[in-house]
């Protein structure tokens, strides 16, 4: 029985990453690339697109 090795590209540096339990930072190749990605989300360089327009006004509330 032959098992296929699945590889993905690291979202940060594009290096090939083997997708299995031994790759503890998957889909990233390393802790460094994982932290770079986290920093981009924290700095709002990355975001999930939305049709909702949220303003910073005083009327804004977390409940709808």
Swiss-Prot record:
Gene3D superfamilies in UniProt: Erythroid Transcription Factor GATA-1, subunit A (3.30.50.10)
Question: What job does this protein perform?
Answer: Inhibits all the catalytic activities of DNA gyrase by preventing its interaction with DNA. Acts by binding directly to the C-terminal domain of GyrB, which probably disrupts DNA binding by the gyrase.
**Which keywords belong to this entry?**
Metal-binding, Zinc
Which one of the record's GO molecular function terms can you name?
DNA topoisomerase type II (double strand cut, ATP-hydrolyzing) inhibitor activity
As cofactor, the record names: Zn(2+)
Gene for this chain: yacG
Task: Identify its protein family.
Answer: Belongs to the DNA gyrase inhibitor YacG family.
The Gene Ontology biological process annotation of the record reads: regulation of DNA-templated transcription
Q: Where does Zn(2+) bind?
A: 10, 13, 29, 33
Q: How is the cofactor bound?
A: Binds 1 zinc ion.
The highest taxon in the source lineage is Bacteria
Assembly and oligomerization: Interacts with GyrB.
This chain belongs to the protein called DNA gyrase inhibitor YacG
């Amino acid at each position: 029985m032959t098992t296929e090795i699945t590889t993905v590209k690291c979202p940060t540096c594009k290096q090939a990453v083997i997708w299995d339990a031994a790759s503890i930072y998957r889909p990233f190749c390393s802790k460094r690339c994982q932290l770079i990605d986290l920093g981009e989300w924290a700095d709002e360089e990355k975001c999930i697109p939305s049709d909702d327009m949220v303003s910073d006004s005083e009327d804004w509330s977390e409940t709808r």
